[in-house]
């Protein structure tokens, strides 16, 4: 069966020679105030291309955040290499929301260098409290679901548990509301307008996520019937990683977020015909999936977009989990021994039939073999029994958008 992983990650052929590079960075970044100042100066000039005449206060925040990210990445790489060299069961937490708030103070405390950073900033004329106020909240969730997801995530960090969290990155996550006696307005909260220094783009990690189309049958040489999902449209899920630090234990786990990309961002033939808007229509339609979380679902299009958002991040996450499993194992009957998936509320519940689809259609398992795997992998947390929180989708919408799952 063909793999759904688009870009194959290959080790360099001259791996022995590459060891020379890693030998050059064997030492850890300094954690004292002088080391922090040197890192900030480096990033001001080389990461942000600023000089003594153009650097502003916000650039100081960016240089500090990037300097801390350097130190997190050192521990992050150590953590991931430990998991690679000592394969153990991995826990994956799937949630549509994460209320992680501001990361600067948390990372300083978890790295154990809060006072060192305060001293470093005072040496260059700044107060840490002022710099902290320049950071915006990450727009990955602001409701009770996001708070509970983050609380669960925080409980895992001190235990050095090999845990991974996945979700979607939204360009304008939630709407900021302003109201008066006469009107109520909603405007996008574009929290990514000045970038997010903690994220690491993974341009090479792309997965196709399919929508619409139809299901057709085919038979193999042994007379077995296989169902194949064909036609429709595909969207690419691109990964962004955010290091999540444990409290002074040098364990840094990963929050992997997915952003929607069009397979073809620009149609040159349509552009040459003079239809400039249609030339980028596919790009706009694809990226709408990761524009705003919880779009208005009063109409059919809003409901369909919500289901798209949920299936999008679930499918990408499961494809990624399977790829990680196959890097060390080949027998899917042992999948549950190496993988545990926790579903946070109803939003990622489409993961159950999606894992069945991937195991049957992509990995070639028989239906009952796949079911034996699926029932041993998932855990589920439900935080409320309010009717509005228990989502339901019409069979007609599900069959139209995801014909293989209906």
Segments predicted by a language model, with ranges:
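A conserved ligand/cofactor-binding region detector
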Residues: 9-406
């Amino acid at each position: 069966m063909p793999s759904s992983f688009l870009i194959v990650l290959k080790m360099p052929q001259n791996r022995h020679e590459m060891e020379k590079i890693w030998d050059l960075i064997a030492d850890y970044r300094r954690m004292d105030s002088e080391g922090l100042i040197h890192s900030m100066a480096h990033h001001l000039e080389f990461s942000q291309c600023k000089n003594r005449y153009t650097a502003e206060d916000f650039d100081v925040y960016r240089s500090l955040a990037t300097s801390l990210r350097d130190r997190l990445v050192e521990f992050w790489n150590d953590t991931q290499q430990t998991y690679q060299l000592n394969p153990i069961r991995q826990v994956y937490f799937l949630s549509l929301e994460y209320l992680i708030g501001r990361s600067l103070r948390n990372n300083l405390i978890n790295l154990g260098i809060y006072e060192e950073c305060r001293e470093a900033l005072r040496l260059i004329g700044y107060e840490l409290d002022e710099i902290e106020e320049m950071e915006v909240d990450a727009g990955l969730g602001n409701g009770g679901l996001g708070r509970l997801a983050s609380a669960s995530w925080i409980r895992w960090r001190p235990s050095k548990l090999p845990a991974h969290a996945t979700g979607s990155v939204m360009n304008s996550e939630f709407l900021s509301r302003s109201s008066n006696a006469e009107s109520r307005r909603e405007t996008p909260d574009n929290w990514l307008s000045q970038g997010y220094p903690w994220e690491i783009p993974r341009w090479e990690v792309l997965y196709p996520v399919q929508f619409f189309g139809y299901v057709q049958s085919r038979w193999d040489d042994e007379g077995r019937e296989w169902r194949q999902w064909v036609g429709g449209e595909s969207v690419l899920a691109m990964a962004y990683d955010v290091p999540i630090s444990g409290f002074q234990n040098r364990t840094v786990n990963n929050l992997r977020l997915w952003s929607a990309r069009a397979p073809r961002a620009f149609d040159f033939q349509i552009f040459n015909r003079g239809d400039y808007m249609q030339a980028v229509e596919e790009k706009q339609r694809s990226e709408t999936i990761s524009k705003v979380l919880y779009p208005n679902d009063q109409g059919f299009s809003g409901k369909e977009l919500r289901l798209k958002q949920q299936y999008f991040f679930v499918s990408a996450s499961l494809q990624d989990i399977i790829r990680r499993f196959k890097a060390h194992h080949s027998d899917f009957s042992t999948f549950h021994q190496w993988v545990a998936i926790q579903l946070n509320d109803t939003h990622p519940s489409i993961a159950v039939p999606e894992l069945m689809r991937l195991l049957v259609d992509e990995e070639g398992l028989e239906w009952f073999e796949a079911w034996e795997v699926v029932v041993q992998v998932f855990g589920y947390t439900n935080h409320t029994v309010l009717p509005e929180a228990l989502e339901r989708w019409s069979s007609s919408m599900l069959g139209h958008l995801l014909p293989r799952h209906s």
